C-alpha cells in the first residue's frame, strides 16, 4: 500500500479521535448534553468552522459552555483537531462533527442550541448560487427552530453585499434583529469579539467587518 496523501492522513486521524470527533452524530439528536457532554450547560455551534481558531478560543475562554464545530470538509476540521491536541489543557467542552449544513435537523432537536455562529461563510456572490448561502431564507428558517427561546444567530462577514443580502432576508422574513453594524470594531460588540484567522488577516488590511444578530423570539 502506497503512502497516503497528507489530507487523507489528517482525515483518518480526525475520524479516529474519540476524544473530540463524534462519529454518527445523528444518534445524539436531543441527547447532546446527556450522552456527549454529560452536563446541562448551554450548547453553542459554529457552522462552517474552517480552521477552527474562533471556536477553539471560545471553548478555551468559556468552560461553562459546550461547543460543537461543524464543517462539511473533514480535511479542514483536522486543523482544529491539531489545535485541540496541542493545547496545554484538555478541553472537554468542545466536539467536532462533519456534516452538510442542510442536514442539521438530523443532528439537533428543536430548542437544543443556545447560539449559532456563522463566521465568514462563503458568500456565493453569483445570483444563481443564492440557494447555497447560509443566510438565505431556507437556512435561517432551518436554524431558528433549533434555538432555545431568545437564542441567537451571530453572523459576521467582510463582504458588504453579502451582509446587505442577509439583512434583507432577515427583514423580509420578519426575523427579530437585535444588532446590525457595518463596522464591528467601532461598535459595542468589539470588546468581546473573537477573531477568526480570516478575520484577522483582512481586518489588518483595513477591511471593515460586518455583523448582524438574529434572535429566536418564538416559543417552541
From Swiss-Prot:
**So which domain of life are we looking at?**
Bacteria
Q: Where is the active site?
A: 122
Reaction(s) catalysed by this chain, per the record, are: guanosine(46) in tRNA + S-adenosyl-L-methionine = N(7)-methylguanosine(46) in tRNA + S-adenosyl-L-homocysteine
Is Transferase found in the keyword set?
yes
Recorded GO molecular functions are: tRNA (guanine(46)-N7)-methyltransferase activity
Keywords (alphabetical) are: Methyltransferase, S-adenosyl-L-methionine, Transferase, tRNA processing
The entry's S-adenosyl-L-methionine-binding residues are 46, 71, 100, 122
Protein's job? Catalyzes the formation of N(7)-methylguanine at position 46 (m7G46) in tRNA.
Q: Which HAMAP family match?
A: tRNA_methyltr_TrmB
- The protein in question is named tRNA (guanine-N(7)-)-methyltransferase
> Which taxonomic lineage does the organism of this UniProt entry have?
Bacteria, Bacillati, Mycoplasmatota, Mycoplasmoidales, Mycoplasmoidaceae
Please name the gene that encodes this protein: trmB
Amino acid at each position: 500500500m502506497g503512502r497516503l496523501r497528507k489530507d487523507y492522513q489528517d482525515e483518518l486521524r480526525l475520524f479516529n479521535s474519540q476524544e473530540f470527533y463524534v462519529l454518527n452524530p445523528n444518534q445524539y439528536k436531543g441527547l447532546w448534553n446527556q450522552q456527549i457532554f454529560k452536563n446541562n450547560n448551554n450548547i453553542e455551534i459554529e457552522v462552517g468552522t474552517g480552521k477552527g481558531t474562533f471556536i477553539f478560543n471560545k471553548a478555551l475562554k468559556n468552560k461553562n459552555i459546550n461547543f460543537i464545530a461543524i464543517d462539511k470538509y473533514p480535511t479542514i476540521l483536522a486543523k482544529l483537531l491539531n489545535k485541540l491536541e496541542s493545547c496545554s489543557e484538555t478541553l472537554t467542552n468542545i466536539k467536532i462533527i462533519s456534516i452538510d449544513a442542510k442536514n442539521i435537523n438530523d443532528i439537533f432537536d428543536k430548542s437544543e442550541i443556545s447560539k449559532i455562529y456563522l463566521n465568514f461563510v462563503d458568500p456565493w456572490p453569483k445570483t444563481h448560487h443564492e440557494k447555497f448561502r447560509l443566510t438565505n431564507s431556507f437556512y435561517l428558517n432551518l436554524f431558528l427552530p433549533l434555538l432555545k427561546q431568545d437564542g441567537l444567530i451571530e453572523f459576521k462577514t467582510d463582504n458588504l453585499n453579502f451582509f446587505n443580502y442577509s439583512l434583507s432576508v432577515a427583514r423580509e422574513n420578519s426575523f427579530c434583529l437585535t444588532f446590525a453594524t457595518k463596522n464591528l470594531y467601532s461598535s459595542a460588540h468589539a470588546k468581546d469579539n473573537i477573531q477568526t484567522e480570516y478575520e484577522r488577516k483582512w481586518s489588518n488590511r483595513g477591511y471593515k467587518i460586518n455583523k448582524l444578530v438574529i434572535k429566536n423570539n418564538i416559543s417552541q
